[in-house]
Amino acid sequence: ASGTVATASNLHVYFHDGTSILKYVNATTTTPITIANLTTGTQITDVPAAATTVTVCGNIPAGTSLPTGGTVAALKAVQLEITSQSAVADVVLSGDDKPLQTWTTGSPALPYAPGITDGDKYAEVEIGPAVARVEIEGLATTASSAVDGFTLEGIYVNNFFEKFNLAGTVVGTKVQYGATPAAYAQGQGLYTPANAGKLFDQSAVAATGIPKEVIPPTAGQRWAYQVVPNGNSTDANEQLQLVFKLSNLAAKAGSSVNFGTGDQFITVRGFK
């Protein structure tokens, strides 16, 4: 739904020296150090003096193996499927690596760390979604449009990457279906039934009202897709795209427009 805030179901805290993981803390709602503790501020003991940096990630999908030791590079190389990010509650959370700073009495004021003492180390880490979310409220004609009616057959994500890693970069080859009309249908490529609502939606909804409009079948919901950046290319054929497949396009009387027969496509790109 619109306006939904991502929340954490698990958090993973790594203390390291930039190369090696020196201490790992897992936080859920039931662990000794809970998510609520980390949210409001808490003391973590036995952090090695050699630790200089803290890294936090969260909402790691079930079945994904995270290291509890080893190298930071191995942690950042952990790969995730974009289809695992289909719901707000599933969105992976991450933040920038933050340095551990030494606290001197009274400077700065740390209301979230009442037990901190002179010489202790602290870090403030902000985390947010590791992927971008594209929401579609609906598709409608304008008053000046020559369109008098249409059916939205489906919405398809194109020019996307299947995987990303905890370093925030894409992995593998970009998935591109190009200008082949038959590619945009359930059962083609990665547009499988299991990926419905993740990489595409296909519902054949007829436009109604004046102006003609199509909205998601469930009130208060939006068509939404999680994506990862696919580069800063200015080439329209390389940018992330949403492809809208329309049928039954009808022109207003007297418009002199002929849409022809068969499906028609609208491609939206230029996402920032």
Q: Where would I find each of the regions flagged by the language model?
A:
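Extracellular beta-sheet/turn segments enriched in Thr/Pro/Gly and aliphatic residues
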Residues: 76-129, 137-139, 268-272
